[in-house]
């Protein structure tokens, strides 16, 4: 490519809260993107600002084909090209520039010495051994601190311990990254020898470093390697470079949406010798990216500035050795509780003791520090690649939430009273409004904290069963069991729930709920596509649910929003996004619900809006706005505002699950009990081993079915077209209940 490329782009400014036209010059040799208010100012050398490209990260968004971001030096710069083609030209040029200036030429290549894989393994084992020695020595600090009588001396020891813990954490990361780098070199390469570094998803655009680089037209330049490593993957495309592992330092990302003010811009041009360019030699490159008005040109508030010295020792759950089953090393065991699963497995006689209550826990650890969140996510970044489906990844055990995805779906019914009251309304208009109310209340209970953790990927054939007692009916003196229902030991006044993992590839979960006395049921299936998106993690929920109100023969078809884990390297938080619908074909009532993601240039988190329509009406009779995990307000056709839902004041009803010893071996809590227990006591090695046993058993069963040419037979659900339907729904068991 040419040594210099120039052209117009629009740049987002915080002062003007909009896009402004700028003339950009990309200097390949200097690794610098400079910008000017006009081409004339560029010719006079009046530079407005610049972006250093060494160690930079490029971000793109598949929902907007003209914008992109560059994150470097703890700043995020937002740009907008004229169209997708122009953005591709800039990104391609920026990619090659970043590649060149992010590389570190291996020392010793000129001498002809080429280390072998055996040399690498030996050094890696030595590093791990020294790490274990250091970890053992750290334990002596606690004894020293306790025995120290002098406050000043104790403070010095505590500071020394903090510094040592910080160093241990860095060493752990280094060992993990070295192992990942080794594994990456063994991966199968594309037939043409090229690996693309672009994957147009809601993600970052991240170039990859070269294992060995030869750029015939450009002199090479050594550069320090940045702190963290991420591996990217995409579709093959023409390139002159063989691409391998990547080095980057990530920040948070939000997608810009304003319309470009740079319409009619000319395409970027490039030239080797154009006299109009202001050439910059490497020694004129500034130490940091800057603008003439710093906070005018980047979103500084997007980044959390952490302390330079973390004030905590790395938890065992963050141990680098738990990243893969083949990793070596040791983890720190720090039991923080004496509680065990055995406490919920005692054989009691009263009703309260017949069920397992270990769901009354704070899995998400809201009190954990931001640094701990960052450390967890850094391990994830080290293992996965851009655009990779996380359901296909053997995740490090410590990043898992202590429950199965099937159990998480049960939280849709944390307000069972709202669900069963749908059929109590006589007017179809009110029934639709009640369906929307239950739907909007169904999401906040599933997310109690901000830590980016992932439920267990359910095993094929895994089942989860539970039920809820309706408020006010908890002490039913004469409960009548539903022997033919999904939960035979539940009463007719209970809301019962059952879920099954009906497919492993693709991962599809089906679940069903009913209340016999209220004559209502719900059937749904969700195919989860969990993708690593660089700056965030996205979960696309593909599928639908159906609320069936048997007394009126009404069926409400609904869809589910996508989920995103944002700002995963700073203060992680979860948001929902996407447009969902609820339709009743019989009555014609319908609703549109939009979960709004937070834009980078402002706005609130967790916003949701909804509009409910009567049949054939284009104007909604009810508009809803608020936060899906807070308060939502309804505005009727007369303009009156009322509180629609207040999730802060609505108590959730605890689900009831059978004791572990009463469960079948394929039920979720029993199947995952060893993993759950060891995660709870922070024994990550034991949890990893238990998880590995489950995965190996699943693989062995799959091989056996393949050898015997047998198909998997589901337990409770069957496929009906593109849907998965419960075998014995209430509508089928009680035909007399039909309208």
Curated annotation (Swiss-Prot):
> What CDD domains does its record include?
PH_ORP9
The record's InterPro entries line, in alphabetical order, gives: OSBP_sf, Oxysterol-bd, Oxysterol-bd_CS, PH-like_dom_sf, PH_domain
Q: Name any one Pfam family assigned in the record.
A: Oxysterol_BP
Show the GO MF annotations. Answer: lipid binding
Locate the PH domain: which residues?
2-99
Keywords on this record? Lipid transport, Lipid-binding, Phosphoprotein, Transport
Which reaction does this chain catalyze? a 1,2-diacyl-sn-glycero-3-phospho-(1D-myo-inositol 4-phosphate)(out) + a 1,2-diacyl-sn-glycero-3-phospho-L-serine(in) = a 1,2-diacyl-sn-glycero-3-phospho-(1D-myo-inositol 4-phosphate)(in) + a 1,2-diacyl-sn-glycero-3-phospho-L-serine(out)
| Region: Disordered, residue numbers | 220-292, 306-371
Q: Where is there biased composition of kind Polar residues?
A: 249-259, 277-292, 306-330, 338-352
Similarity comment text for this entry? Belongs to the OSBP family.
What does this protein's UniProt record list under function?
Interacts with OSBPL11 to function as lipid transfer proteins. Together they form a heterodimer that localizes at the ER-trans-Golgi membrane contact sites, and exchanges phosphatidylserine (1,2-diacyl-sn-glycero-3-phospho-L-serine, PS) for phosphatidylinositol-4-phosphate (1,2-diacyl-sn-glycero-3-phospho-(1D-myo-inositol 4-phosphate), PI(4)P) between the two organelles, a step that is critical for sphingomyelin synthesis in the Golgi complex.
What protein am I looking at? Answer: Oxysterol-binding protein-related protein 9
